[in-house]
Structure formats: structure tokens, C-alpha cells
A protein has these predicted regions:
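Generic recognition of short, well-ordered alpha-helical segments
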Residues: 32-36, 61, 86
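N-terminal beta-loop-helix "entrance" segment that forms/cooperates
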Residues: 57-67
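Structural micro-motif
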Residues: 65-75
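Short alpha-helical
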Residues: 29-30, 57-58, 89
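Secretory/periplasmic and organellar redox-cofactor proteins
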Residues: 1-8, 101
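Non-catalytic, surface beta->alpha helical segment in thiol-disulfide oxidoreductase systems
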Residues: 76-101
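Local sequence-structure signature of Cys/Sec-based thiol-disulfide redox active-site neighborhoods
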Residues: 6-42
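Thiol-based oxidoreductase modules, predominantly thioredoxin-like and allied folds used
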Residues: 46-59
Length: 101
């Protein structure tokens, strides 16, 4: 079951750009889709995307902390945003929030 939590309140970063961490696994279509969509937002300057392999020490630590039911694990400003495929509506709300900053 996918953990549906509301989008976290985003703290203001000094640069106005929020950090998004994407924890991914190999051969994961949801991971590829999320990376493609978030990378486009990174290139547009709306966020700063960091991709972390699940099998890396940092990835294992994030998995232990957030315990995702699916991949990718997506963190916004260090807080759980979603695990599994990111719903388009939830991502659209995040984009609207980032553009309003």
C-alpha cells in the first residue's frame, strides 16, 4: 500500500529552491518516470534534485528512516513526500507551490 501523506510544508530556503531527494532502485519504471519529471523541474530552476541509489549507504539510511512501501522514495526538504509512483495531481500541487514562492 502506498503511503499517502499530505505534502509537507516547505521551509524557505535561502536560495528559494527546495531540495528534493529521489531514492531509486535499478530497473524501476516508477523511478525512471519520477526522475524524468523531477529532473525537468530541476532544469527549470524550481527545485534541486539529488538522486540516491537505494543500495548506497545514504540510500539504505533513508530507507531505514522512512520505510517506503515502494520505490522511488521521494523526499521534499528532507521530509517524506511520497513513495511509489508520484501522482500527477500531487506533483502539480507541489509545482504550484514552488512557482508561488
Amino acid at each position: 500500500m502506498v503511503n499517502e501523506t499530505p505534502a509537507p510544508a516547505l521551509p524557505s530556503a535561502p536560495t528559494g529552491v527546495v531540495d528534493v531527494t529521489l531514492v531509486t532502485t535499478p530497473a524501476c519504471h516508477f523511478c525512471d518516470d519520477a526522475h524524468e519529471r523531477l529532473d525537468a523541474l530541476d532544469r527549470a530552476g524550481l527545485l534541486r534534485l539529488t538522486t540516491v541509489p537505494a543500495e548506497s549507504p545514504e540510500g539504505r539510511a533513508l530507507i531505514a528512516e522512512h520505510r517506503p512501501g515502494m520505490f522511488p522514495l521521494t523526499l521534499v526538504a528532507g521530509r517524506h513526500f511520497h513513495d511509489g509512483r508520484i501522482p500527477r495531481g500531487k506533483l502539480a500541487r507541489l509545482v504550484d507551490h514552488l512557482r508561488a514562492r
